[in-house]
From Swiss-Prot:
The lineage of its organism: Eukaryota, Metazoa, Ecdysozoa, Arthropoda, Hexapoda. Residues 64-134 form the Chitin-binding type R&R domain. The keyword tRNA-binding does not apply. This is Cuticle protein 18.6, isoform B. PANTHER family: CCP84AA-RELATED, STRUCTURAL CONTITUENT OF CUTICLE. One of its GO terms (molecular function) is structural constituent of cuticle. It comes from Locusta migratoria (Migratory locust). Sequence repeats lie at residues 21-24, 33-36, 41-44, 133-136, 139-142, 150-153. GO terms for cellular component: extracellular matrix; extracellular space. Component of the cuticle of migratory locust which contains more than 100 different structural proteins. PROSITE patterns: CHIT_BIND_RR_1 (PS00233), CHIT_BIND_RR_2 (PS51155). InterPro entries: CHIT_BIND_RR_consensus (IPR031311), Insect_cuticle (IPR000618), Insect_Cuticle_Struc_Prot (IPR051217). The keyword Repeat applies. It comes from the Eukaryota.
Length: 185
């Protein structure tokens, strides 16, 4: 049965006769369930092909490179005039370029480059076909007479007068109180 229920006392019994039962506790259950056997699937074996190493394409190497190029621009509309030519034989580069300067002179640069001497350039300048323009005489600056400016006058106007209005008169009306609805019974 239920343990620890309060004791029942007959009505009218003196207070000293009343009492309470000592608390009692049920014994713990000592039953344990057997472990459940669990089954797991074996890991899936996966087969992959070995990675194929990409072989780089063979880069052609020229132990004795050679090239030669040249260009020429003569534009009468814009006045652009320039030329260049260059050649390479192994590790030695030789070339030249020229251009027309704004004053009409021709600047020519002859250059060489090799592993022993590095880069070397020689600059030649030929006089132009037309002489440089003479400087234009500039007129002397004109001195302007100072202009007198009067200081501003500060003037303040009086504030505008506003019309005053009296507050509206509130009239109180006294009378019997209004009754709402009928009496409740």
């Amino acid at each position: 049965g239920y343990l620890g229920a309060p004791a029942v006392v007959a009505p009218g019994a003196p207070l000293a006769a009343r009492g309470y039962a000592a608390p009692a506790y049920a014994a713990p259950l000592a039953r344990y369930a057997a472990p459940v056997a669990r089954a797991y699937a074996a890991p899936v074996a996966r087969a992959y092909a070995p990675a194929v190493a990409a072989t780089p394409a063979a880069v052609e190497y020229d132990p004795h490179p050679q090239y030669s190029f040249a260009y020429n621009v003569q534009d009468a509309h814009t006045g652009d005039s320039k030329t260049q030519h260059e050649s390479r034989d192994g590790d030695v580069v030789q070339g030249s370029y020229s251009l027309a300067e704004p004053d009409g002179s021709i600047r020519t640069v002859d250059y060489t480059a090799d592993p022993v001497n590095g880069f070397n350039a020689v600059v030649h300048k030929e006089a132009g076909a037309h002489p440089a323009a003479a400087p234009v005489a500039v007129a002397a600056p004109v001195a302007h007479a100072p202009v007198a400016v009067a200081a501003p006058v500060r003037a303040y106007a009086a504030p505008l007068a506003r019309a005053a209005y009296a507050a509206p008169i509130a009239r109180a009306a006294y009378g019997p109180a209004l009754a709402y609805g009928g009496a409740y019974h």
